[in-house]
């Protein structure tokens, strides 16, 4: 089953992406490097719950 998650910028800008992940094949928290347009840099985005 795929669950919706939110990827929040570690730069503290408040920018986030939403995506899905398969909890069965990837039980650990997701960390991925993506572009943050507020600071115009690639930074690490960490998984958080969708509120």
From Swiss-Prot:
GO terms for molecular function: structural constituent of ribosome. Coiled coil: none annotated. Disulfide bonds: none annotated. InterPro entries: Ribosomal_bL33 (IPR001705), Ribosomal_bL33_CS (IPR018264), Ribosomal_bL33_sf (IPR038584), Ribosomal_zn-bd (IPR011332). This is Large ribosomal subunit protein bL33. Belongs to the bacterial ribosomal protein bL33 family. GO terms for biological process: translation. It comes from the Bacteria. Keywords: Ribonucleoprotein, Ribosomal protein. One of its GO terms (cellular component) is cytosolic large ribosomal subunit.
């Amino acid at each position: 089953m795929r669950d919706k998650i939110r990827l929040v910028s570690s730069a503290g800008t408040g920018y986030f992406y939403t995506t899905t992940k398969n909890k069965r094949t990837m039980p650990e928290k997701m960390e991925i490097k993506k572009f943050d347009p507020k600071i115009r840099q690639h930074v690490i985005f960490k998984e958080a719950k969708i509120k």
